[in-house]
Amino acid sequence: DDDGRAYQFYSSEHNATMYISLLTDDYLKPSGRFTRNFIGESREAPAVFKQDGKYYMLSSGCTGWNPNVAEIAVADSIMGEWRTIGNPCTGPDADKTFYAQSTYVQPVAGKKNAYIAMFDRWKKTDLEDSRYVWLPIQIEGGVLTIPWRDKWNMDVFDK
């Protein structure tokens, strides 16, 4: 986090509950302080980022190799109460997260409020042929969306 603290996010209870665990100051082990989140919702692949003082988590459902809908949640603090907002993806195959799964959200260097959502597109029959999908996150009026784009460049962040 921007305060020097580190956290581990993991699913437990047969992948039904996501835990957020504060690590010790040396980042080597759990501190013993944790929260249970999305209880019974079976979420995985958390990609967490901070925007205007709020924490956002992009995540996927636990459906094995089968694609599913993404969800974004927001919290005022990383160990606080997370509120699910819904699917941020729009466009073709948005209900399947563009046949991909969240993996990371990359802040764009030199740009304020600019982020790239990174996804894994697993090919279960040939893992070596799996791909990545990178898409810009749009932020308008506090609403985050990830629209499908066949192609794009960094100019999208200048608008």
Go through each PLM region and give its residues.
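Carbohydrate-active catalytic/glycan-binding domains of CAZyme proteins
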Residues: 1-159
